[in-house]
Amino acid sequence: KQDFFDYIPPDVANILVIGNPPFGRVSSLAVQFFNHAAQWARVIAFIVPRTFRRVSIQNKLDMHFKLVHDTELPTNPCCFTPPMMAKCCFQIWERINVGENGTPILRQKVKLPINHPRWTFLPYGPTDTTGQPTPPTGADFAIRAYGGKCGDICINGLEKLRPKSWHWIKSNGSAPELAEQFGTLDYSFSQNTARQNSIGRADLVSLYSNTFDTK
């Protein structure tokens, strides 16, 4: 046994690294394990949290590798012993071949915008007596950002909502039309987490743009 981050393998070609690394907070340890293995591996085959499907995580992985396989692992029945409540997938990443001139071909980072001309994300309102933020004023509707009902839209009673659990939307045009469009989107992407479903601002912008801005 030894610390994996201290391990350097023999100088041989075509090394395959197989494992189920610890996840860490927001998948941070799994990313570190991947990037250490990437220094000398040809192929990396890991069981990882489903957050590894998200652009924000893939942008942190060694750019010399490309994803070639992804299989979702069941949560019910749990495939782990002992059982654990974590949403995982099995991914295979392969080192990208060098170009004709011998220079490495790198995967490119994906930059997702966090704003859209059709609406404005409103910041939270002022904090209350307990130090928690209050709902902002002026929002046309809110979209649930966390939990099993991720993507739900609330139009009425906004002042009763917990601000941190929602995205607060101010339409720059027709609010009813925009809310209706958001209501047709497929939010299953929010399940690509280790535990609680979530969808961020960049996810919302990307989902909306890919659905409506390409038509």
Residues covered by each model-derived region:
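Class I S-adenosyl-L-methionine-dependent methyltransferase catalytic core
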Residues: 1-215
